[in-house]
Amino acid sequence: MPEVTLRHEFDCDEQTYWDKTTFDQAFNERLYRDVLKFPGYELLSLVDDENAKTRRVRIDPPLGNMPAAVKKAVGDRFSYVEEGRFDKKTRRYHFQIVPSAMRDKAKTFGELYCEKLGDNRVARIARVTVEVKVFMVGGLVEEKILGDVRHSYEAAARFTREYLKELGLTA
């Protein structure tokens, strides 16, 4: 299964990273709608208990310049639900993507975690794995998804730095 690991550094502590970005509704609204230009973003649920934060988000990504074979496989409209759980003890966010099309043939899952680099500096590591089992186009779809993941995480990292600075939360 193809996998990508991305690392981005931010001038904040780990708690600020999680609270003011990953689990902050205003941040995510701006990220998905304004920065990434996704047609749809909706927080379906966020449950915070003593052990974990569990979140479900529905996302409608732009289909844009998708190869014809891929577009045929997923259809004219595509969305997905991200189901994630942040374990407060291990401080890792594990997620899976439930697509609106090809549910039995496509798997995307991963994890996010932070490494402390200093008093007010962290590296956010994102590891994403993709598997698409569709004859003839599976590899194309995997390539498209991983390319989109790389692009989205790079844009999100730039926005995260700007957003933290805008809020006065950077070191």
PLM regions: where:
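Glycine-rich portal/gate segments that line the openings of hydrophobic small-molecule binding cavities
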Residues: E42-Q96
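Short secondary-structure junctions
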Residues: L31-F38, K88-T90, D104-K105
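A conserved amphipathic terminal alpha-helix motif
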Residues: F86-K88, G139-A171
